[in-house]
């Protein structure tokens, strides 16, 4: 079809087109894959970038992606024998068949002129002729039923071991690490006979001339070897079309196509355990703990109990597994809601309601207005004339304008279920692929004279993800289901994302492991020295004295194991489960935030991936879709300028019309317009203006059943619908349409306008004209379009041009979409002469018909009289301008990536305050790579040359279209383009494809490695962008939920992004950072005292604390403070974080979790451990003698030292707490109370079991000792005194920015900003009056389609038949 992706032209004819098969996709000459598979392109690009290969980026612009030009007609496309084949291809005459399409009797079809070759076997005679339909045969199959059909249509399928690249490839796919969904391994069809397999003897593969195809040289292929598992790859010659039997469910079931089940869940029963364990042990800390647990099992080497590591590790994994299962259960619930949606499927001669999951390939379904399509469907018939229907693809490509699809004339009459049940035949469809806008198939129908083969193309394909609009119902046959639908083929498996904090955490863990190694080596060397130097003096310890190299090595190994286990808790095992729980609760807080709840459609925020919450506080780039994300998809006719006079639906008091210097300025309301239409000098202009709005369009009126009911307009463009509604509001109501006339009602009188010709809109012309014979008999040309093309076609006698231009500037400054309206009268002779030229152009055969039509249109579109201009508001979502302004204040760069045209995107940029009046627009809109490079280089040179003198980077905004972006994303130009884009405050990319959206995100991610990227969108076309970014946010609510279901967080409105980032993001980042640092601190403090003790116990490896007391340190005694800090701490209130968005930069700069901060916490922990151990040693020096004369002993001293350590780390938690709540009181002082109570119980019960005999009698002695209580509080105060002094000095003499805000919060200091903002708004209004904008957009959004075909097909004056069809569309006397 139209538009070829950038992949180069078709190469020379090849006799070996299909070389190999990998992952069920054909590979083409030269080993290059089809450029249409987004997944493969993204993976190839990522691999090339990582390997450093200098290859161009596979970028496909929006226009190339969907086809911007007119559809090209293939000369062979309408002939029988398969799509794209000529009739001669079905005979033995190959003279007319080019080499790429035919080799040795095989036919190939080039899918929609896009180089995506699909092999079509010419031995279709092996398939049984479908006689009558399955239902007409009484539910029986010819030849023995389904089993026989299955044997006859044997399919050479991949085995479980060979699909997806062998056993390991299959396992990777099942674990979600392969190239797509685990369910997306597609079966390959093979037309074979008699159960013959690939290469079996079912039938001969020779062509009709009896010449065998040339044999390929067999070469060894590791991919074929499969490591000894399964069988080799299937022969590519087995590829054939998908055969779908009409009204024959058993025959289709025998083919075992994938079902219509769609899953976005991360796990299933089989994959949960291996995938979960693989993900968990990709974390360095978990591998470390597993290794330590293994060392503890070595008898005689571990100084602690052998289960003190493995049990906490299992507990951590269990908690993580529970969290993962809960989150995956939510995904499964969302999938179940979709899979259990209701659809109407033909069963027998009636439509029965069933679940989407039960819809199968070959089913005939009925879809009604406003319903989404349950699968990929080929349109058979609709309620509209000529089999037309409107669909909305906003969830696929982001476009809100309706697309027109049309059924084949041969099937468009099948409007009743009984007619459909008698439909017999088969479809030969291309294999599933990811191209949204191409499709080739043939439909073979049973007719009275035999079979009739009809070509199918994208005009008949209705995709899953699209929605039926403005059409009561359609009938269609399902061709692709589930993960084989084009929507799901364009989706990618959700990647496992690692946060910046998590990566830094792994680095810190490695650092602590390094410290652990150093401590272990120091202790081991100390032990060896003590054994050698002091061995005789301490012979009573019976220590071995290694005297040989082997003995030394053995002792060294044993000591290293001992000390590794002893110091292993420097890495807190509870940290990771604590962080998991903290992040999980952050997700709950996001979900439960009523400020982000959208009550209009009962949609709360939903954090689907809580692992990423802290990165919400570190975002530097936001990539946003426009349609449905920034806007509401609702067009409203707001203002009009007619004959130099402005009219509006609502007129503010300060803008009401007044007379100044004899000139009327300001706005009139619509009431005044109706008065002027009757008795004002501008009445003729008003009449033609409103008549143009009511007639020059492609809108179809739909009347209600009741007489006098409100007319509903079916508009392919929301702009046109708004204009026609506006005309109706002003008294010119469009009522009916005939193929050659339109009818409007004015003042109760019906007027007929005879349609003579249509000059269609396209993106080059930027205008649309209709030629009517008006009710007064005069022929007039009505034209509407962009001001740039209308104004240059005006005659000299136009008195209102200047006033209209002024009004256009005002509309553009308000972000409204504008159109200019003009007309001219044409004599009968001039029209007849022109019409001959136009008819000749319309019948031109060849590729230049569109050009000839444009030339013919130019001949009559001149000397116009300007009637006025319209202003349409593409209403933004509530709060969008304020949100974008706040994000920019927070130093977040906002890039808008949209499929809309450049003018529309700029308009929206102005409306949402992404672009401001002070900004200088840098526009790149080139047609070649060289021109794009030259444009970018000149702009960069100009910026760098000016420096800080005349150009402020804050005033620059970049606007680039899809074609230029294609060139800019090439490898040799991408860095230069990114340098220019980074210099700009705002970037708008127009006419971009879904693939380009993802590539732009990948480009920024590649070069801005330290930046966090967030992508937000609402449609399926945004999924690849969402998954490419560090954080994906989906807009849920009005449209489909594909983006929301694939995102990490979903919200209902764009404005909620402000609180999500500035409040929840900032809180999460600060909380997670504080939780991690505190967890490291508390463990280092405790276990460094153990290290200092090794110098006292002659490096014997003895422990200072009882084993289970050590274990319970992280599990019970210090588990609550990190949770309180991580879940409840608020370093700044939500109100002030919103008021001062500049605070957000702290997360961008990673102020709370950089290496410097970690070192400070580490040194602080070491300092505390030294104070605690040294003073504890001094207090208990020589074993303190108790009141009863007994010596305290080793275990009593260790337990006494444990108390001040615990009190110190809990006191530190109190010092770093920003706001105290009752939960902080429970968590921090409460934890100390827990220890005092627990140690009393444990010290009493454990020795009695006996479980810990060394604790016998210790607790009574400790609790009765005043030295114990004095030491506990005195040492804690001594340690924390330095911390308190440092905190005081920091706030008083070197405060951070947030310290000032905390003071404002504490003392409730009033802010002057509200008054300042009011003053700034007043200044902006003054500037808007003083300055006129040059950028204006025009309000056409429909695709470049054939409007004439629509206008000349409808006759709304006819009544509908029994099934809602037009009575004129059914042959007379035909039954139902």
From Swiss-Prot:
Spans annotated as Disordered: 1-151, 180-217
GO biological process, one term: phospholipid translocation
Record InterPro entries: ATPase_P-typ_cyto_dom_N, ATPase_P-typ_P_site, ATPase_P-typ_TM_dom_sf, ATPase_P-typ_transduc_dom_A_sf, HAD-like_sf, HAD_sf, P-type_ATPase_IV, P-type_ATPase_N
Gene3D superfamilies from the UniProt entry: Calcium-transporting ATPase, cytoplasmic domain N (3.40.1110.10), Calcium-transporting ATPase, cytoplasmic transduction domain A (2.70.150.10), HAD superfamily/HAD-like (3.40.50.1000)
Consequence of gene disruption: Reduces the amount of toxins sulfacetamide (SFA) and fumonisin B1 (FB1) secreted from cells. Decreases cell population growth, conidia formation, conidial germination rate. Abolishes microsclerotia formation and severely disrupts melanin production. Decreases virulence in cotton and thale cress.
Binding site for a 1,2-diacyl-sn-glycero-3-phospho-(1D-myo-inositol 4-phosphate): 1212, 1282, 1286-1287, 1298-1299
Record topological domains on the Cytoplasmic side: 1-306, 531-559, 1129-1165, 1212-1224, 1279-1376
Site (Involved in the release of the transported lipid into the cytosolic leaflet): 573
Annotated glycan sites: 339, 433, 490, 679, 762, 1083
Xref: PROSITE patterns: ATPASE_E1_E2
Record: residues binding Mg(2+): 625, 627, 1018, 1022
Residues in the Extracellular compartment per record: 328-509, 581-1107, 1187-1190, 1246-1257
Cofactor: Mg(2+)
Chemical reaction(s) catalysed: ATP + H2O + phospholipidSide 1 = ADP + phosphate + phospholipidSide 2; a 1,2-diacyl-sn-glycero-3-phospho-L-serine(out) + ATP + H2O = a 1,2-diacyl-sn-glycero-3-phospho-L-serine(in) + ADP + phosphate + H(+); a 1,2-diacyl-sn-glycero-3-phosphoethanolamine(out) + ATP + H2O = a 1,2-diacyl-sn-glycero-3-phosphoethanolamine(in) + ADP + phosphate + H(+)
Main subcellular location of this protein, as a coarse class: membrane
Compartment(s) where it occurs, according to its Swiss-Prot or TrEMBL record: Cell membrane; Golgi apparatus, trans-Golgi network membrane
The family this protein is said to belong to: Belongs to the cation transport ATPase (P-type) (TC 3.A.3) family. Type IV subfamily.
Protein name, entry field: Phospholipid-transporting ATPase DRS2
Name of the gene this protein is made from: DRS2
């Amino acid at each position: 079809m139209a538009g070829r992706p950038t992949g180069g032209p078709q190469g020379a004819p090849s006799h070996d087109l299909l070389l190999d098969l990998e992952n069920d996709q054909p590979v083409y000459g030269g080993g290059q894959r089809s450029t249409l598979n987004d997944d493969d392109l993204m993976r190839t690009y990522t691999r090339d970038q990582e390997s450093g290969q200098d290859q161009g980026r596979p970028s496909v612009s929006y226009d190339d992606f969907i086809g911007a030009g007119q559809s090209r007609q293939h000369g062979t496309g309408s002939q029988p024998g398969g799509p794209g084949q000529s009739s001669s291809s079905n005979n033995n005459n190959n003279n007319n068949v080019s080499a790429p399409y035919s080799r040795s009797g095989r036919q190939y079809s080039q899918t929609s002129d896009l180089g995506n070759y699909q092999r079509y076997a010419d031995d279709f005679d092996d398939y049984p002729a479908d006689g009558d339909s399955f239902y007409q045969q009484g539910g029986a199959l010819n030849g023995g039923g389904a089993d026989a059909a299955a044997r006859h249509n044997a399919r050479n399928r991949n085995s479980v071991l060979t699909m997806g690249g062998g056993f390991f490839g299959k396992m990777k796919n099942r674990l979600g690490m392969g190239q797509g969904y685990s369910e997306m391994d597609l079966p390959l069809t093979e037309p074979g006979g008699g159960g013959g397999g690939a290469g079996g003897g079912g039938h001969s593969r020779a062509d009709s001339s009896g010449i065998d195809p040339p044999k390929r040289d067999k070469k060894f292929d590791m991919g074929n070897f499969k490591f000894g598992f399964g069988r080799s790859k299937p022969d590519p010659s087995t590829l054939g079309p998908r055969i779908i039997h009409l009204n024959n469910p058993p025959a289709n079931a025998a083919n075992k196509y994938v079902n219509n089940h769609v899953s976005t869940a991360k796990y299933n029963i089989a994959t949960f355990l291996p995938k979960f364990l693989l993900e968990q042990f990709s974390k360095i800390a978990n591998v470390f703990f597993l290794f330590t647990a293994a060392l503890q099992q070595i008898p005689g080497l571990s100084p602690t109990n052998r289960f003190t590591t493995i049990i906490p590790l299992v507990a951590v994994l269990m908690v993580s597994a529970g969290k993962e299962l809960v989150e995956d259960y939510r995904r499964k619930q969302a999938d179940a809601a979709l899979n259990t949606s209701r659809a109407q499927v033909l069963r027998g001669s009636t439509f029965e309601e069933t679940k989407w999951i039960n819809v199968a390939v070959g089913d005939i379904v009925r879809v009604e207005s406003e319903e989404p399509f349950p699968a990929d469907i080929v349109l058979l018939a609709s309620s509209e004339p000529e089999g037309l229907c409107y669909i909305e693809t906003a969830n696929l490509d982001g476009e809100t304008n309706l697309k027109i699809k049309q059924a084949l004339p041969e099937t468009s009459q099948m409007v009743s279920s009984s007619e459909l049940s008698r439909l017999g035949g088969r479809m030969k469809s291309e294999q599933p692929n990811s191209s949204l806008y191409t499709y080739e198939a043939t439909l073979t129908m049973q007719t009275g004279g035999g079979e009739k083969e009809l070509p199918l193309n994208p005009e008949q394909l209705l995709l899953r993800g699209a929605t039926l609009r403005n059409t009561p119902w359609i009938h269609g046959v399902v061709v692709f289901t589930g993960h084989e639908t084009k929507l799901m083929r364009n989706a990618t498996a959700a990647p496992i994302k690692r946060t910046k904090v998590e990566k830094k955490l792994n680095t810190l863990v490695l650092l602590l492991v390094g410290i652990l190694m150093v401590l272990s080596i120091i202790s081991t060397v100390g032990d060896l020295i003590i054994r050698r130097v002091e061995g005789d003096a301490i012979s009573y310890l019976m220590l071995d004295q290694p005297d040989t190299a082997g003995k030394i090595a053995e002792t060294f190994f044993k000591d290293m194991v001992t000390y590794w286990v002893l110091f292993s808790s420097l890495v807190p095992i509870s940290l990771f489960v604590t962080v998991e729980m903290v992040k999980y609760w952050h997700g709950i807080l996001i979900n439960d935030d009523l400020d982000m709840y959208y009550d209009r459609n009962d949609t709360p925020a939903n954090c689907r991936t809580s692992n990423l919450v802290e990165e919400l506080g570190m975002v530097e780039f936001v990539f946003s879709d426009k349609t449905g994300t920034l806007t509401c998809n609702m067009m409203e006719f707001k203002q009009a300028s007619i004959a130099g006079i402005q009219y509006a639906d609502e007129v503010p008091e300060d803008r009401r019309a007044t007379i100044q210097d004899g000139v009327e300025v300001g706005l009139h309301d619509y009431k005044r317009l109706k008065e002027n239409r009757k008795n004002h000098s501008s009445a003729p202009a008003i009449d033609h203006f409103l008549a143009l709005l009511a007639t020059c369009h492609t809108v179809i009126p739909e009347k209600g059943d009741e007489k006098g009911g409100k007319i509903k307009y079916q508009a392919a463009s929301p702009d046109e619908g708004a204009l026609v509604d506006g005309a109706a509001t002003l008294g010119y109501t469009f009522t009916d349409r005939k193929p050659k006339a339109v009818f409007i009602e004015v003042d109760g009188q019906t007027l007929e306008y005879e349609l003579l010709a249509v000059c269609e809109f396209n993106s080059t012309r930027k205008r649309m004209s209709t030629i009517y014979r008006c009710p007064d008999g005069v022929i007039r040309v009505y034209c509407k379009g962009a001001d740039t093309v209308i104004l240059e076609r005006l005659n000299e006698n136009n008195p209102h041009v200047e006033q209209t231009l002024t009004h256009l500037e005002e509309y553009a400054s308000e972000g409204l979409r504008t159109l200019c309206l003009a007309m001219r009268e044409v004599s009968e002779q001039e029209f007849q002469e022109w019409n001959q030229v136009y008819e000749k152009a319309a019948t031109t055969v060849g590729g230049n018909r569109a050009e000839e039509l444009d030339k013919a249109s130019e001949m009559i579109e001149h000397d116009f009289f300007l009637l006025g201009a319209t202003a349409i508001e593409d209403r933004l979502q509530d709060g969008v301008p304020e949100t974008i302004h706040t994000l920019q204040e927070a130093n977040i760069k906002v890039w808008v990536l949209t499929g809309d045209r450049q003018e529309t995107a700029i308009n929206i940029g102005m409306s949402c305050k992404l672009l401001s009046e002070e900004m200088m627009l840098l526009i790149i809109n080139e047609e070649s790579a060289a021109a794009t490079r030259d444009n970018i280089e000149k702009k960069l040179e100009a910026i760098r040359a000016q420096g800080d003198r005349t150009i402020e980077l804050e005033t620059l905004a970049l606007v680039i279209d899809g074609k230029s972006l294609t060139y800019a994303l090439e490898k040799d130009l991408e860095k230069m383009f990114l340098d220019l884009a980074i210099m700009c405050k705002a970037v708008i990319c127009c006419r971009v494809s879904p693939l380009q959206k993802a590539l732009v995100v990948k480009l920024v991610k590649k070069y801005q490695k330290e930046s966090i990227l967030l992508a937000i969108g609402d449609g399926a076309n945004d999924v690849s962008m969402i998954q490419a970014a560090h954080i994906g946010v989906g807009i849920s609510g009005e449209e489909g939920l594909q983006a929301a279901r694939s995102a990490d967080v979903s919200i209902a409105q764009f404005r909620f992004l402000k609180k999500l980032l500035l409040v929840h993001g900032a809180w999460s980042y600060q909380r997670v950072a504080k939780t991690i640092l505190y967890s490291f601190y508390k463990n280092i403090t405790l276990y460094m005292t153990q290290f200092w003790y090794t110098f006292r116990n002659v490096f014997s490896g003895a422990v200072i604390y009882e084993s289970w007391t050590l274990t319970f340190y992280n599990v019970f005694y210090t588990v609550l403070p990190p949770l309180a800090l991580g879940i409840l701490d608020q370093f700044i209130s939500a109100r002030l974080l919103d008021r001062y968005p500049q605070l957000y930069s702290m997360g961008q700069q990673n102020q709370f979790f950089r290496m410097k901060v970690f070192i400070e916490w580490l040194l602080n922990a070491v300092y505390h451990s030294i104070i605690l151990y040294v003073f504890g040693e001094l207090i208990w020096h020589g074993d303190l003698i108790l009141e009863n004369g007994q010596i305290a002993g080793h275990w009593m001293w260790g337990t006494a030292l444990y108390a001040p350590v615990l009190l110190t780390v809990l006191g530190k938690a109190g010092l770093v707490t920003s706001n105290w709540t009752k939960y902080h009181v429970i968590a921090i002082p409460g934890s100390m109370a827990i220890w005092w109570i627990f140690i009393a119980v444990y010290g009493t019960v454990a020795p009695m079991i006996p479980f810990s005999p060394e604790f016998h009698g210790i607790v009574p002695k400790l609790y009765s000792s005043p030295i114990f209580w004095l030491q506990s509080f005195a040492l804690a105060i001594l340690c924390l005194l330095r911390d308190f002094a440092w905190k005081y000095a920091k706030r008083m003499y070197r405060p951070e920015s947030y310290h000032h805000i905390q003071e404002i919060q504490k003392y409730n200091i009033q802010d002057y900003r509200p008054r300042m903002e009011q003053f700034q708004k007043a200044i902006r209004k003054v500037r808007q009056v003083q300055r006129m904008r040059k950028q204006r957009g025009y309000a056409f959004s429909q695709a470049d389609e054939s409007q004439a075909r629509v206008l000349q097909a409808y006759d709304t004056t006819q009544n509908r038949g029994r099934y809602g069809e037009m009575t004129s569309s059914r042959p007379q006397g035909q039954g139902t």
